[in-house]
């Protein structure tokens, strides 16, 4: 029905690199952003140069402007614009703060639903990172989403995040903007996953027993099947896979043990597997063997 325009914040606010200038954010979001609500940096990470820590920078990047023309819209959004990423590294979307303001008179009916989407995920419930619902009578609103997960730099450069909006009950002519939204993301850029992968603290290790950790980082469906059983099942399935038959090994034919024994005993009838012809040319023997004859695979059995 109406046109929905997203007016997004254009600002960059470096946290870790103190030598760079800091730019002031819009007043709408200035009091809403608290880095400590999303991430906790240690004293070493705050004071040491980025070259000596896993965390390279913590930034609030500038965001693109998005314009929507219909009630239901799904638009790409660049939450990392202006952020210097690390090649072959990672970026963590620690949080997202959204502030909206209705461009309507007081006591208007209707409302809006806003959702942050990861378009890589095929299942809708897994692609939804967070959502918010509000009515048009609430002139200004602010909410935050904490995705708190990392993606590779290569994936981040493809623009994997989207914003879905759904406006209902707002009676406005086409070509006008009923709602303005500002997006500010908090992201952490780092070179490797080791730091974030060592969150667990080992409490107890016994010989032949499981390792006891303080944090459950494995999904429930994985915990139901021990990894040793998974490995055994995986190997057994691979061994049962049929291999391609080969009639020749190093240019020589292979006879099965039964036919070979009959041949050595002077029996001219070698069963159903009969050598029809031998043609020698350029050192290669062309021997035709029936399908019932055993064959050998010259490929390695290792995997």
From Swiss-Prot:
Transports viral genome to neighboring plant cells directly through plasmosdesmata, without any budding. The movement protein allows efficient cell to cell propagation, by bypassing the host cell wall barrier. Forms a ribonucleoprotein complex with viral RNA. Binds microtubules and modulates microtubule stability. Can bind double-stranded DNA. One of its GO terms (biological process) is transport of virus in host, cell to cell. GO terms for molecular function: RNA binding. InterPro entries: TMV_movement, Viral_movement. GO terms for cellular component: host cell cytoplasm; host cell plasmodesma; host cytoskeleton. The lineage of its organism: Viruses, Riboviria, Orthornavirae, Kitrinoviricota, Alsuviricetes. The keyword Signal does not apply. It is found in: Host cytoplasm, Host cytoskeleton; Host cell junction, Host plasmodesma. Its main location: host cell. Belongs to the tobamovirus movement protein family. This is Movement protein. Pfam families: MP (PF01107). Keywords: Host cell junction, Host cytoplasm, Host cytoskeleton, RNA-binding, Transport, Viral movement protein.
